Amino acid sequence: ARCEQCPSYCCQSDSPPECDGCE
């Protein structure tokens, strides 16, 4: 998924594992 489609914290370099696939 694109970063814009994920929670804003997933856009950060230190995003947690549940953000995997969001870039």
Curated annotation (Swiss-Prot):
Q: In which tissues is it expressed?
A: Expressed by the venom duct.
Where is this protein found?
A: Secreted
Name one cellular component (GO) term: extracellular region
Main subcellular localization, coarse class?
A: secreted
Keyword list (alphabetical) reads:
Disulfide bond, Knottin, Neurotoxin, Secreted, Toxin
Q: Would the keyword Membrane be found if you checked this record's keyword annotation? A: no
| S-S bridge residues | 3-11, 6-19, 10-22
This entry's Gene Ontology molecular function terms read: toxin activity
Domain observations: The presence of a 'disulfide through disulfide knot' structurally defines this protein as a knottin.
Summarize the protein's role.
Causes abnormal twist followed by immobility when injected into C.elegans.
- Stated name of the protein: Augerpeptide hhe7a
User: Which organism is this entry from?
Assistant: Hastula hectica (Sea snail)
Q: What is the lineage of its organism?
A: Eukaryota, Metazoa, Spiralia, Lophotrochozoa, Mollusca
